[in-house]
């Protein structure tokens, strides 16, 4: 472990000099060491290997806000995971299907789908009527229902003040999401603190718009970054 840590620490000094493909290879070395630590710290709780393997191949997650975004991300072979941030009760099935047809993991942000309620039944609707792999939500009750339905779950959390740290700590124990997405994702020191205190893998999202932001979040300990920026998707 010490050797792996020393290697990645040296690599991080000049990560911005590497291409994204080279960074992804270095990132995998780092993830091997971190995965071992997580396996011990999660007290026997198994990590979600399917999702985890996808972000190990490419830690950049495409967050799509409209049909143009959807078309672009589906055409990018390197993108493995897609966060769906738009849609309505009539269109969400087709949106998810396009992502699945392109061979990607489809995660629906259920809070942002028009025409659906904020109650647990919305998760049942997504599970029954789409081929979505999982859900994203800021609501603990919906995350809990997603886990009951054997879906991947991402609890989205906005870091507004210092109370957020304790709230995240409580939520991870009470709800046990598979992943926690923290926003904004451009605060590496804060991301690092959350990663150290959390037994749940962290995704950094929000305002990720360039290579420097991506590298800073990953170096701080995030398992992946989510971004709506097309240039970030193509790195």
Question: What are the residue ranges of the model-derived segments?
Answer:
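Cysteine-centered motifs
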Residues: 3-4
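Conserved N-terminal beta1-alpha1 strand-loop-helix module at the mouth
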Residues: 44-98, 105, 114-116, 131
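Short beta-strand/loop segments at the ligand-binding rim of alpha/beta enzyme cores
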Residues: 54-60, 102-111, 149-158, 196-205
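Catalytic beta/alpha-barrel core
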Residues: 61-65, 81-88, 109-115, 132-138, ...
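Short, acidic/polar
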Residues: 64-74, 163-170, 210
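Conserved, mostly hydrophobic/aromatic
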Residues: 73, 139, 217
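Glycine-rich phosphate-binding active-site loops on the catalytic face of alpha/beta enzymes
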Residues: 84, 207-213, 220-235
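Active-site-adjacent beta->alpha loops and helix N-cap segments on the catalytic face
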Residues: 86-99, 115-120, 137-151, 160-166, ...
């Amino acid at each position: 472990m010490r050797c792996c840590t020393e290697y990645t620490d040296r690599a991080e000094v000049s990560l911005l000099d590497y291409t994204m493909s080279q960074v992804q290879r270095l990132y995998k070395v780092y993830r091997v060491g971190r995965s071992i630590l997580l396996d011990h710290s999660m007290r026997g709780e198994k990590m979600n290997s399917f999702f985890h393997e996808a972000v190990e191949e490419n830690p950049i997650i495409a967050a799509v806000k409209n049909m143009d975004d959807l078309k672009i991300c589906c055409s990018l072979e390197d993108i493995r995971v897609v966060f769906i941030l738009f849609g309505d009760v009539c269109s969400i099935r087709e949106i998810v299907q396009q992502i699945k047809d392109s061979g990607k993991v489809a995660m629906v942000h259920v809070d942002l789908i028009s025409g659906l309620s904020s109650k647990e039944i919305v998760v049942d609707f997504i599970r029954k009527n789409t081929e979505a792999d999982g859900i994203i939500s800021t609501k603990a009750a919906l995350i809990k229902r997603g886990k009951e339905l054997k879906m991947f779950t991402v609890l989205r959390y906005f870091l507004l003040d210092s109370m957020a740290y304790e709230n995240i700590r409580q939520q991870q124990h009470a709800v046990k999401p598979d992943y926690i997405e923290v926003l904004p994702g451009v605060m590496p020191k804060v991301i690092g603190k959350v990663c150290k205190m959390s037994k749940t893998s962290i995704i950094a999202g929000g305002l990720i718009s360039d290579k420097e932001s991506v590298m800073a979040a990953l170096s701080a300990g995030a398992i992946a970054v989510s971004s709506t920026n097309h240039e970030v998707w193509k790195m």
